[in-house]
C-alpha cells in the first residue's frame, strides 16, 4: 500500500493501493474525489478560497502535483480543476466521481464581528466549485473549532478522520 502525505497547497491522485493523507487541517479544507468504478481518486489540501490571479499550472504528469511558483494549488478553484483534470487523465469520467470534504475549522476567535471566517470561506468556495463542476458531495465533516487529519483509502473510498482540539 502506497501512502502519500499531502501538505497545504498540494494535491495527489492514485489508484486502489494508495492512501492519501492530509495532516493538520485547521481552516484548510481537504477535498477527496473518488471514482468507485475504477477505485481511484485524489485529494487536494486547499488553503484559500479562490485565486483571483491568472496562474499557469505545471502540466507534467507525476504521482504528486505540487504547487507551482505562484502557488495556484492553494486555491479551491484551481486545485479542484487540477484534481478533476488528473482524474480524467487516469480514465475517470466526471459522472462517476463523488466528493467528500473535511476541515474548514475556526481555530482562532474571529476578531472582527460580522466578517466571514477563512474556514467558512474555504468551505463555501469548495462547495461552490464542486457544484459548478457537477460533482456531488456525499460526505463531509466541516466547520467547528477542532483541527482534523484525514486518511483517504482509495481501495474503498473510506476516509478516516482524527480530530484534535
Regions inferred by a protein language model and the residue ranges of each:
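Short glycine-rich phosphate-binding loop at a beta-alpha junction
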Residues: 95-103
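Short, basic and Ser/Thr-rich N-terminal targeting/leader segments
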Residues: 7, 14, 25-27, 95, ...
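Phosphate/ribose-phosphate-bearing ligand recognition and processing surfaces
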Residues: 106-119
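Amphipathic alpha-helical interface surfaces
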Residues: 76-83, 97, 122, 126, ...
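Divalent-metal-activated hydrolytic enzyme cores
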Residues: 118-165
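Conserved mixed alpha/beta catalytic, RNA-binding, or beta-rich assembly cores of soluble enzyme
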Residues: 21-90
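Acidic, glycine-rich active-site loops and adjacent beta-strand->loop/helix elements
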Residues: 47-50, 103-107, 143-145
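Phosphate-centric recognition/catalysis
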Residues: 2-19, 23, 37
Amino acid at each position: 500500500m502506497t501512502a502519500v502525505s499531502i501538505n497545504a497547497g498540494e494535491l495527489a491522485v492514485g489508484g486502489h493501493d494508495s492512501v492519501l493523507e492530509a495532516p493538520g487541517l485547521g481552516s484548510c479544507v481537504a477535498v477527496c474525489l473518488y471514482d468507485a468504478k475504477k477505485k481511484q481518486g485524489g485529494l487536494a489540501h486547499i488553503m484559500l478560497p479562490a485565486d483571483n490571479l491568472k496562474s499557469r499550472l505545471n502540466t507534467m504528469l507525476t504521482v504528486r502535483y505540487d504547487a507551482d511558483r505562484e502557488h495556484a494549488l492553494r486555491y479551491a478553484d484551481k486545485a479542484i480543476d487540477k484534481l478533476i483534470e488528473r482524474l480524467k487523465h487516469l480514465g475517470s469520467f466526471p459522472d462517476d466521481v463523488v466528493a467528500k470534504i473535511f476541515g474548514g475549522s475556526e481555530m482562532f476567535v474571529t476578531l472582527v464581528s460580522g466578517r466571514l471566517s477563512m474556514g467558512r470561506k474555504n468551505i463555501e468556495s469548495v462547495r461552490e466549485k464542486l457544484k459548478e463542476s457537477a460533482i456531488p458531495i456525499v460526505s463531509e465533516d466541516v466547520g467547528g473549532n477542532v483541527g482534523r487529519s484525514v486518511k483517504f483509502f482509495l481501495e474503498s473510498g473510506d476516509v478516516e478522520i482524527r480530530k484534535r482540539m
